[in-house]
From Swiss-Prot:
Alphabetic keyword roster: AIDS, Apoptosis, Clathrin-mediated endocytosis of virus by host, Cleavage on pair of basic residues, Coiled coil, Disulfide bond, Fusion of virus membrane with host endosomal membrane, Fusion of virus membrane with host membrane, Glycoprotein, Host cell membrane, Host endosome, Host membrane, Host-virus interaction, Lipoprotein, Membrane, Palmitate, Signal, Transmembrane, Transmembrane helix, Viral attachment to host cell, Viral envelope protein, Viral immunoevasion, Viral penetration into host cytoplasm, Virion, Virus endocytosis by host, Virus entry into host cell
Region called V5, residue ranges: 461-473, 463-473
Classification of source organism: Viruses, Riboviria, Pararnavirae, Artverviricota, Revtraviricetes
Segments traversing the membrane: 686-706
Annotated spans, V4: 388-418
CD4-binding loop as annotated region, ranges: 367-377
Mod. after translation: Highly glycosylated by host. The high number of glycan on the protein is reffered to as 'glycan shield' because it contributes to hide protein sequence from adaptive immune system. Palmitoylation of the transmembrane protein and of Env polyprotein (prior to its proteolytic cleavage) is essential for their association with host cell membrane lipid rafts. Palmitoylation is therefore required for envelope trafficking to classical lipid rafts, but not for viral replication.
Region (V2): 162-201
Signal peptide boundaries: 1-31
GO cellular component, one term: viral envelope
Residues the record marks as site: Cleavage: 513-514
Protein name: Envelope glycoprotein gp160
Length: 856
């Protein structure tokens, strides 16, 4: 009976075991995903970083000091790379572009730095006795410049002949000097017609530009350091703000000429197809409208006067340069623009403005007032700062059919009368003014108008008025730079990517470290590809970052060499150094992370970190075949730091395991077992074995006592010893005999340490054999509990189904009753409304009937 019970129990065990094995097989069938690290993925994020410059400075005159200090820039790349990003859409915003702010700060810094070694004109802040310069001619050159009267002579009072007392080379001696100054540069003292002072003496420190300084704009290319990239929008009608579908990546921008001008944008880039107007908000009249022309309009400017300049000593080692005299007729500086070309340009601008302002009448008017830099078109021409009246350009009205009415003449050219100003309030900053020394001889310059800066008049009734008035604007040089940088943005390269795969790091091995970088132009070309396609080209994508850093170092050394005679770095040299340090920092940071994760020198690195479905529950096929790396990075962006920390913890644990494995290598050779240095280990092992045996004997002694107590008696000894045979002089008695048997002794059959071990092991096996019923009882209890538990679960499940059905029926009945009640109430309300409506409709009829009865 007992054997049959055991067989029945084992049959139940077999069923439960089969079920458990099936569950394990089902669980193991769902394949686990693991985190895999990829280095060189085409992922970027918006960033602000220090840009450096590239320029062809050697192509320009080296005798003069260029204010832009482009000799400190790196040479431009003769074959610039531009990689088109297929299937990539990126957001741009020209109005919130750090490149604009950076260029503005750079240009101001360059101007300030170029003026540092120059002469301060503080001694000239004295009383000037000025009289109007008479329009006389020099007898030797009386016919030199009388060929054209249409250019106009200078108005009376526009130039002053001023005399003043100045300190000579000897400080305690004064002498009287004279200079020809423009009216715009002096201001009357106490409304006196003869006493004047320089215009900025009471507010600014006037610095004279050094004699050999040049303001000629040289194209400057802004470049991103290694680890960063510049994205370029190639949409031909891009408004400057919003998404761009035609995106490419470049290392440097195009050559941007830092032309400091107002109202008209000169010598910039052109729109490719149509005229484009850009504004941060067209409905806000406080926002400047930047007009980007598709065809340039040439403007030719001249100062016909042949000026002679002289040098006045104003102290030891300091000289003031001023106009000595003017040879020939003193004529007005002016600029000429083709009337037909300008009118055609305005027509195209008007058509674009009407698209924004609902076909209203467009009126162009002159500036409403302000500083001379804003009221007039200010720019530098051949070293002189011209201030031209642009009212002939902005004096027209355009009706709905793009016809216009102007009040100017019908000559072929539009002539702008210009004034020259020598004291310049730089960048509209308080406390900074520059004196531009006069240029000898005649001055001629030709520029291309490539854009306009417009402002729109506001008012309360602009919505009802059919006219929009636009005026030339400017003054904030950021708009000048923004007109060229509108299509660029700086991004930082994030070459490290993590994604789930089926591969797991199986073994711990020591990897050889290698220096591998990321070519930000090359691998961004795969940005529009799926993750699977991009991961195939990781080797190509991860090559030239380190070489880019080395090239940056060479560029920096070349820049320092070019400026070693100055013993100081310009803003460009500092930016070169910052860019290199930043590139090295980025590279070392990425390599440090790879080292923390045990992935140094690897492009694809498997790990032992399991992928958590809460990070992303997308399938592998959906991830690798349908998503780009940029999309995937946005998907897991919130969990990146967590994944990085898990990778670091996993690698730390793996290194500990590796250390333990390496510590076991010293046992690989059998001869090392007999090394004297290992004897201490042998002693420790022996002590542990002896301690274990003693502990085992104590345990079995306790178990034996418990067993004997359970049987109802306690032995006198823990081991039964066989009787010790008596000697020949003391023979043993027989059964019937009495005697002193209490004095007999017994001993073990075998003595020694091994005998103790044998006895203990034998007792262990006997104990296990005698208590096998305990296991069967426990198994039976577990089986009964499982069966009862299963029956209880089934009962609860049936009960739950019953009550859920009852609740469902009750809910349906309640909803039906509610619907019926609502329907009946709705019908009553509708009926009441209908009766009320009929009563109202019948009121005229009732009134008519009442009147008829009254009349009858």
């Amino acid at each position: 009976m007992r054997v049959k019970g055991i067989r029945r129990n084992y049959q139940h065990w077999w069923g439960w075991g089969t079920m458990l094995l099936g569950l394990l097989m089902i669980c193991s069938a769902t394949e686990k995903l693991w985190v895999t690290v990829y280095y060189g993925v085409p992922v970027w994020k918006e960033a602000t970083t220090t840009l450096f410059c590239a320029s062809d400075a050697k192509a320009y005159d080296t005798e003069v000091h260029n204010v832009w200090a482009t000799q400190a820039c790196v040479p431009t790349d003769p074959n610039p790379q531009e990689v088109e990003l297929v299937n990539v859409t990126e957001n741009f915003n020209m109005w919130k572009n750090n490149m604009v702010e950076q260029m503005h700060e750079d240009i101001i810094s360059l101007w300030d730095q170029s003026l540092k070694p120059c002469v301060k004109l503080t001694p000239l802040c004295v009383t000037l006795n000025c009289t109007d310069l008479r329009n006389t001619t020099n007898t030797n050159n009386s016919t030199a410049n009388n060929n054209s009267n249409s250019e106009g002579t200078i108005k009376g009072g526009e130039m002053k002949n001023c005399s003043f007392n100045i300190t000579t080379s000897i400080r305690d001696k004064m002498q009287k000097e004279y200079a020809l100054l423009y009216k715009l540069d002096i201001v009357s003292i106490d409304n006196d017609s003869t006493s004047y002072r320089l215009i900025s003496c009471n507010t600014s420190v006037i610095t004279q530009a050094c004699p050999k300084i040049s303001f000629e704009p040289i194209p400057i290319h802004y470049c991103a350091p290694a680890g960063f990239a510049i994205l370029k929008c190639n949409d031909k009608k891009f408004s400057g703000k919003g998404s761009c579908k035609n995106v490419s990546t470049v290392q440097c921008t195009h050559g941007i000429r830092p032309v400091v001008s107002t109202q008209l944008l000169l010598n910039g880039s052109l729109a490719e197809e149509e005229v484009v107007i850009r504004s941060e908000n067209f409905t806000d009249n406080a926002k400047t409208i930047i007009v980007h022309l598709n065809e340039s309009v040439q403007i030719n400017c001249t100062r016909p006067n042949y000026n002679k300049r002289k040098r006045i000593h104003i102290g030891p080692g300091r000289a003031f340069y001023t106009t000595k005299n003017i040879i020939g007729t003193i004529r007005q500086a002016h600029c000429n623009i083709s009337r037909a070309k300008w009118n055609d340009t305005l027509r195209q601008i008007v058509s674009k403005l009407k698209e924004q302002f609902k076909n209203k009448t467009i009126v162009f008017n002159q500036s409403s007032g302000g500083d001379p830099e804003i009221v007039m078109h200010s720019f530098n021409c051949g070293g002189e700062f011209f201030y031209c009246n642009t009212s002939p350009l902005f004096n027209s009205t355009w009706n709905g059919n793009n016809t216009w009415n102007n009040t100017t003449g019908s000559n072929n050219n539009i002539t702008l009368q210009c004034k020259i100003k020598q004291i310049i309030n730089m960048w509209q900053e308080v406390g900074k003014a520059m004196y531009a020394p006069p240029i000898e001889g005649q001055i001629r310059c030709s520029s291309n108008i490539t854009g306009l800066l417009l402002t729109r008049d506001g008012g309360k009734d602009t919505d009802t008025n059919d006219t929009e008035i636009f005026r030339p604007g400017g003054g904030d040089m950021r708009d000048n730079w923004r007109s060229e940088l509108y299509k660029y943005k700086v991004v930082t390269i994030e070459p490290l990517g993590v994604a789930p795969t089926k591969a797991k790091r199986r073994v711990v091995q020591r990897e050889k470290r290698a220096a591998i970088g990321a070519l930000f132009l090359g691998f961004l070309g795969a940005a529009g590809s799926t993750m699977g396609a991009a991961s195939v080209t990781l080797t190509v994508q991860a090559r030239l970052l380190l070489s880019g850093i080395v090239q940056q170092q060479n560029n920096l050394l070349r820049a320092i060499e070019a400026q070693q005679h100055m013993l100081q770095l310009t803003v460009w040299g500092i930016k070169q150094l910052q860019a290199r340090v930043l590139a090295v920092e980025r590279y070392l940071k990425d390599q440090q992370l790879l080292g923390f994760w045990g992935c140094s020198g690897k492009l694809i690195c498997t790990t032992t970190v399991p992928w958590n479905a809460s990070w992303s529950n997308k399938s592998l096929d959906d991830i690798w075949n349908n998503m780009t790396w940029m999309q995937w990075e946005r998907e897991i962006d919130n969990y990146t730091s967590l994944i990085y920390s898990l990778l670091e913890k996993s690698q730390t644990q793996q290194e500990k395991n590796e250390q333990e494995l390496l510590e076991l290598d010293k046992w690989a050779s059998l001869w090392n077992w007999f090394d004297i240095t290992n004897w201490l280990w042998y002693i420790k092992i022996f002590i542990m074995i002896v301690g274990g045996l003693v502990g085992l004997r104590i345990v079995f002694a306790v178990l034996s006592i418990v067993n004997r107590v359970r049987q109802g008696y306690s032995p006198l000894s823990l081991q039964t010893r066989p009787p010790v045979p008596r000697g020949p002089d003391r023979p043993e008695g027989i059964e019937e005999e009495g005697g002193e048997r209490d004095r007999d002794t017994s001993g073990r059959l075998v003595h020694g340490f091994l005998a103790i071990i044998w006895v203990d092991l034998r007792s262990l096996f006997l104990f296990s054999y005698h208590h096998r019923d305990l296991l069967l009882i426990a198994a039976r209890i577990v089986e009964l509990l499982g069966r009862r538990g299963w029956e209880v679960l089934k009962y609860w499940w049936n009960l739950l189904q019953y009550w859920s059905q009852e609740l469902k029926s009750s809910a349906v009945s309640l909803l039906n009753a509610t619907a019926i009640a609502v329907a009946e109430g709705t019908d009553r309300v509708i009926e009441v409304l209908q009766r009320a409506g009929r009563a109202i409709l019948h009121i005229p009829t009732r009134i008519r009937q009442g009147l008829e009865r009254a009349l009858l």
